[in-house]
Design a protein with these regions (language model features):
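A short acidic, helix-capping loop that chelates divalent metal ions and anchors anionic groups
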Residues: 69-73
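Flavin (primarily FAD) cofactor-binding/catalytic cores of flavoenzymes
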Residues: 2-38, 42-44, 77-353
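Redox-cofactor-proximal catalytic regions of oxidoreductases
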Residues: 40-67
Length: 353
């Protein structure tokens, strides 16, 4: 028989944002559960490519209440270290995570919100959606894409360069993921890196610490009614982590302009130039994973739900956490999600009094 349960708050998503929410809900004295679709702790970090490293030291990659310990021999921790940290965090605070549980929909149900899942129904006084973006990869509608006879992957499906040894690979995208995957492939594959505009590297001495400090300063300026035009964000898009820096400086990363269409065997540029490809890897970003909130009818422009901070404007019982700057500055990062998680927990505690 399906189960029907009641709680103060349902948190949807057991990655870094969901755990940060759980930490602050516990401190606020609220009854809550965290519903996670994955079978194990670690969120999206357990699904990344093998060589992925953070671009901040461990101390600048921590959730509230517990510093991430350094990884021996590494300035910037790898994804496996992050998974171990999140697993420990969840256990240390005895967070009530239920998994694997997939949420199919959130509905208004009188004074509560009804959360329908694969393991039954929860009725909650408030909901925090923290499902992130990793489960909703975006690939642009490029002419000819369905007719390409090679292999097409998104960032989420890339694992290691040895899978593409000796093959002609085109990497599409101008952000950190594209640069890191291109650098990963540059030594074993016949690589072409394609970007919409010329890649902009941040200075080599800038890492995630500076980016977080800038995001914090930007939020303070906005809160005070000022326009923040300073900081590192205007200087580049790509953090020059050591593998990217090495590949760039040795001439292995030579970006090409964006092509206009795919052919059966590769790609074609506006001047008629073509290039063959065995594989195209789309490092073209993600969209918020919000389909479970569709029954509430809240979606606005660009697929987002209009918010004030983390609170949905049209449904004060719903908070959105960790989807990007529109749900809090740097809220999609380990260190940045703590403050909006705290704000969401406080707002919910006030609402439920």
């Amino acid at each position: 028989m399906p189960q029907h349960r009641t709680t103060d708050v349902v948190v949807i998503g057991g990655g870094q944002a969901g755990l940060a929410a759980g930490y602050h809900l516990r401190r606020a004295g609220l009854d809550f559960v965290i519903l996670d679709a994955d079978t194990a702790p670690g969120g999206a970090w357990q699904h990344t490519w093998d060589s992925l490293h953070l671009f901040s030291p461990a101390a600048y990659s921590s959730l509230p209440g517990r510093l991430m310990p350094p990884q021996p021999g590494e300035t910037y921790p790898d994804a496996a270290h992050v998974v171990a940290y999140l697993t420990d965090y969840e256990q240390r605070y005895d967070l009530p995570v239920h998994r694997p549980v997939r949420v199919s929909g959130v509905h208004r149900d009188g004074e509560r919100l009804r959360v329908e899942t694969t393991s039954g129904t929860w009725r909650a006084r408030a909901v925090i959606s923290a499902t992130g973006t990793w489960s909703r990869p975006f690939i642009p509608a490029i002419p000819g894409r369905t007719g390409f006879q090679g292999t097409q992957l998104h960032t989420v499906e890339y694992a290691r360069p040895s899978d593409f040894a000796g093959r002609k690979v085109i990497v599409v995208g101008g952000g950190n993921s594209a640069a890191q995957i291109a650098a990963d492939l540059a030594y074993e594959s016949d690589l072409t890196w394609v970007t919409l505009r010329e890649p902009r590297y941040l200075a080599d001495d800038i890492d995630g610490r500076a980016l977080f400090d800038h995001a914090t300063a930007r939020r303070k300026a906005l809160d005070e009614g000022r326009t923040d035009t300073s900081g590192v964000a205007s200087l580049g898009d790509i953090v020059a982590v050591p593998p990217v820096r090495t590949a760039r400086d040795t001439g292995l990363l030579k970006p090409q302009p964006m092509f206009t269409r795919l052919t059966a065997t590769g790609v074609e540029w506006p001047d008629g130039t073509t290039a063959d490809a065995d594989t195209i890897i789309w490092c073209t970003g993600f969209r918020p994973a919000l389909s479970h909130l569709a029954p509430l009818g809240l979606r606005g422009p660009r697929g987002r739900i209009p918010t004030a901070g983390t609170r949905a404007l049209a449904e004060p019982r719903l908070h959105l956490l960790g989807y990007g700057d529109w749900t809090g500055p740097a809220s999609a990062t380990l260190i940045g999600v703590g403050r909006p998680a705290r704000d969401a927990a406080r707002a919910i505690a006030e609402l439920l009094r």
